[in-house]
């Protein structure tokens, strides 16, 4: 298992200041493109996660009936407020996996020396959890697989291998460099939120050769528009039959962050293949990821 000098943060924690400056200089138009779709109760999610829910906690009518105004007696202005519970996994909609999200082997280890027997409490992991997620302000690259293939959306279980990643970059006129964030479009979010249509296209994505291709180029994070990032079922699970070899290679072995359920449709429509990538994960102690609303700045 790889152990980094940034054991709880990974290579993204070593982003050089000069790379931040170079990324900032990429902005030419000042246009902001959101890479996330709205979240809502009943939204499509990976089946291993709990459903997303929003419930009222206080309403203007409710506080009057209950006499529960936090500022004392009913005011002449009739001031009220609304507050809510949001109950959800941190892996709802566009999100980033913390390093303490996936484990492997009998010792249930994760990147940077984390192990379930030592670092997993009843209130979540204490090593490599979401409170350690760094901010991202670096160059982003879009790899648009359906545009390259001339289709709207990749077919169910279609792998994107290293050779195709390289060919797409050539067609787009971009190259992947150290410190980049790579986002891979399959067209899946173009079907959002029609769960029935989406199910017919689950789940295309990078295979293990594509993961190694990204590692060879020094990326610090990678994302896609599907719930699993990598192609499922894995065409090359290895001798141990690992169902998610890409997560293992990137997140567990090298500390490269993975994002899922990104909305890359507007980037693709405008043929924006390189951009300033900005993401500010929410630092929640004990969480295994963070909902994010990343922005591509053009």
Regions found by a protein language model. Give the residues of each.
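Active-/binding-site microenvironments in catalytic and ligand-binding cores
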Residues: 1-298
């Amino acid at each position: 298992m790889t152990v980094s000098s940034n054991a709880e943060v990974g290579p993204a924690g070593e982003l050089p200041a000069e790379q931040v400056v170079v990324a900032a200089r990429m902005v030419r138009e000042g246009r902001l493109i959101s890479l996330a779709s709205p979240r809502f109760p009943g939204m499509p999610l990976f089946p291993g996660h709990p459903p997303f829910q929003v419930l009222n906690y206080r309403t203007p009518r409710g506080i009057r009936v209950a006499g529960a105004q936090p500022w004392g007696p009913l005011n002449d202005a009739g001031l009220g407020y609304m507050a809510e519970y949001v109950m959800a996994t941190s892996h709802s909609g566009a999100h980033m996996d913390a390093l303490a999200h996936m484990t492997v082997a009998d010792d249930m280890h994760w990147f940077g020396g984390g192990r379930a027997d030592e670092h997993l409490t009843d209130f979540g992991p204490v090593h490599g959890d979401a409170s350690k997620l760094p901010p991202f302000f670096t160059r982003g690259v879009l790899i648009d697989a359906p545009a390259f293939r001339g289709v709207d959306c990749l077919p169910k279980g279609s792998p994107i291998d290293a050779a195709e990643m390289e060919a797409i970059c050539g067609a787009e006129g971009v190259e992947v460099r150290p410190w980049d964030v790579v986002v891979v479009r399959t067209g899946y979010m173009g079907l959002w939120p029609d769960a029935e249509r989406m199910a017919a296209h689950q789940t295309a994505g990078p295979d293990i050769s594509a993961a190694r291709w990204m590692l060879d180029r020094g990326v610090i994070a990678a994302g896609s528009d599907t719930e699993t990032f990598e192609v499922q079922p894995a065409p090359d699970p290895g001798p141990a039959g690992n169902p998610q070899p890409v997560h293992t290679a990137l997140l567990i072995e090298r500390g490269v962050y993975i994002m899922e359920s990104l909305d890359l449709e507007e980037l693709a429509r405008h043929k924006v293949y390189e951009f300033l990538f900005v993401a500010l994960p929410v630092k929640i102690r004990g969480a295994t990821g963070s909902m994010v609303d990343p922005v591509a700045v053009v």
